[in-house]
A protein has these predicted regions:
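Short helix-loop-beta junction
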Residues: 178-181
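Catalytic nucleophile-elbow at a beta strand-turn-alpha helix junction centered on a G-D-S/GDSL motif
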Residues: 156-176
Length: 181
């Protein structure tokens, strides 16, 4: 799904939440109507979802939140397949508006070289915000961005679905689980 010139990967659509933000749905709302109430609630779980984009300007600002009273969640920032710098690699998302600011990497050429030498699957200029678990809500995305191009992502896709460990929602370091590698 494309939202404000970014791709919401593994998200089929968004719906307005009562707090003014958006719930990101893994399957369309029309499908959710045939599910049990527990399964319908799991439809809002963002495990395995990513916000992907190319940064055309200097920076982008993502505004996310957890539902009120929810435990915090995390987002991991990658340049292609490579973790961003230590100051922005992992961000905590709270039950209030949380801003994640992403800038261009310090050394784009080094990232490009490492990606090519190691045959990494994602283009190093593609910014990926990996959402780990829970109902992360989207408020807004600001900045000069464009969606990924087809050649920036692996041709083959892998979908893991099953228990929370299988698809990564309860793993201690979700970006390093088998489905995410």
């Amino acid at each position: 799904m494309i939202f404000k010139n970014t791709e919401l990967y593994n998200i089929s659509e968004i719906e307005a939440a009562q707090n003014g933000s958006f719930n990101m749905l893994r399957v369309p709302k029309s499908v959710e109507k045939g599910l049990s109430s527990d399964a319908a609630e799991r439809n809002k779980n963002c495990c395995g979802a990513e916000i992907r984009f190319n940064l055309k300007g200097d920076k982008a600002k993502l505004k996310l939140r957890m539902p009120e009273g929810s435990a915090a969640s995390r987002a991991t920032v990658l340049y292609g397949s490579i973790y961003s710098g230590w100051e922005e690699a992992v961000k905590t998302i709270y039950d209030r508006e949380t801003e994640i600011v992403v800038s261009n990497p310090y050394d784009k050429e080094a990232l490009k070289r490492l990606t090519e030498e190691n045959r990494l699957p994602f283009d190093s200029s593609l910014i990926r915000i990996m959402l780990e678990h829970s109902n992360v809500q989207l408020i807004d995305i600001e900045g000069d961005t464009e969606p990924p191009r087809k050649e920036q992502t692996p041709e083959r896709k892998y979908l893991a679905y099953g228990s929370s460990i299988t698809h990564g929602s309860i793993g201690l370091n979700a970006p390093n689980t088998y489905p995410n590698r």
